[in-house]
Structures are given as C-alpha cells and as structure tokens.
Amino acid sequence: MDTEYIRSHIRTIPDFPETGIQFKDITPLLLDTKANELTLSALQKPFDTFTIDKVVGLESRGFLFGPSLAAKFQAGFVPARKKGKLPYKTIQKEYGLEYGKDILEMHTDAINPGDKVIIHDDLLATGGTAKAATELVLELGGQVVGYSFIIELSFLSGKNQLLKEIPSHSIIQY
C-alpha cells in the first residue's frame, strides 16, 4: 500500500529539538524517488477535481513539496515565511506557538482577489501556522479551498484551528 511505503520513509527522532518531542523527519522521503513520487501523488489526489490558482507553502518544510504540488496543478507557489525573510512588501499575522508567539508573512502581491488556494505544510500539529496562513490568504482576497499535509498529529487537534467547511487532507496520521 502506498501509504505504508510513505510511512516507512518517515523517521521519528526522539527528544528533538527538545526533550519530550518526537520529531517526524520527512527527509527520507526526499532521498527515495518512489517515496517522493508517491507522496506528491497522495498530496495531489484529494484535490484533482479542484481549480487551484496558488499553493501556499509554510516555512520551511512546506517548501519541499509545495512547489512540485503547485506545478502539478499548473498553479503558482507562494512561500509563507517568518517575519523578515521576504524582500518585498508584506502583510503579516501573529500566531501562537506552544512556547510563545511568531509572525508569518506573505508578499502583498502573492494572492490575487478570487484566487483559489491550497495551504500546504509537511505537518499539521496545533494548526497555528496554517490558521495564520489562512487569515493572510483571506486578507489578500483569496479563497482557501483545501489544506494539504503529509503528516497530521491528530492528538494535538490542529484541525480545530482550520476552516471547518474546507477539506483538510493528511497522508499519515499519528
């Protein structure tokens, strides 16, 4: 089964980046051509019938599959980055983390009014970053039509932070 092949290429690193965290490392997916292709296909499939104008990739591991996913949809790729990393005019949204707050930014010209957008990241944990990205897309006049994740940590209930009426897909759940 494709999902199991993908799962077999995600390794858990205990106590990284701090004690008690079980870090899900997706870099083995990038080393194996078959795992890479299966992951990209699994990310695309739930949205095959959708019209997609942009894929927003969340810093930083959303940049690994995000551009390829955008290319599959013949859509543009939009990097959503932490404050101070984008060179042009930006809008920003503050969001909460388990250990504090951060700020997510997008270029002001990245989303056009009416653009249909998928928000993509490698992992859905608490949902704070995806929620901030959603708010930025909406502020620029875009329409979020889907959420795309490789991994979902279901026990953290991150989906509760996302727009309820919008489909959210993750390949692997822990």
Residue ranges and their predicted role:
Residues M1-Y174:
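PRPP-associated nucleotide enzymes
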